[in-house]
Amino acid sequence: MSAPALVALAPGGRDPEAVATITALVAEVRALRPDLRVEVAFLERARPSFDTVVDRLARAGHDEVVVVPLLLTNEGSASGDVLSAVRAAGERHPGLRISASEVLGVSPSFLGVLDERLRDALRVHRVRELDALVLAGEGSGDALANQTVARLARMWGARHHLPVTAAYATTAPPATGEAVRAFRGEGRRHIAVGSLFLAPGALTSRATELALEAGAVAISEPLGAHPEVARGVLARYAVGAVELVPV
């Protein structure tokens, strides 16, 4: 019996750099598990679409599919869109057992990725000293989703023995610029921002712009196509594949 196919499903967007980053991440997943059928798909405004990928898998004879939503927080509307798309695909292909795993989420193992990305940014800007950190995430109207980012921020600060604030690009305060200004108001001058985003995009650009305007000395690139993130995708897939096994 072959393993279920894995579909890594991203929200989508018009930014070609974001699409390229997600595609590269899924290539990392394939490299770690060459025995699996692994596909990338987008919900909207980018190709291949989720429907196209599911139809292709069904035609190829796959009868089980695990969808891993490439979302860092379990934000209500985005997660709802994924579940609606999965249900519709199951109705379109009655012989196909298809389910969605938990969202990729944020794992403590991603702290190493954050460190790596930030070191790269500090090297580019020739920054040798830091006295505060800001962890910038997407933000949500869901307080629990925001608490997940804040929890990771506390872990990141403890790792480096530096004060840290979680900031958000949408909805929830503080914005990255506000967080940087608050630290500067305390007399801190060497403040770096870690980007807790999966790929580039409008929110990432806005968070970066606000942080630089407020005086941040460096802003890291998003997590992107990193083997540790790919392992996170496979961990979600593994749980989803087990749940497909009849009991």
Report residues per predicted region.
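Active-site-proximal alpha-helix that buttresses catalytic centers in soluble enzyme cores
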Residues: 1-247
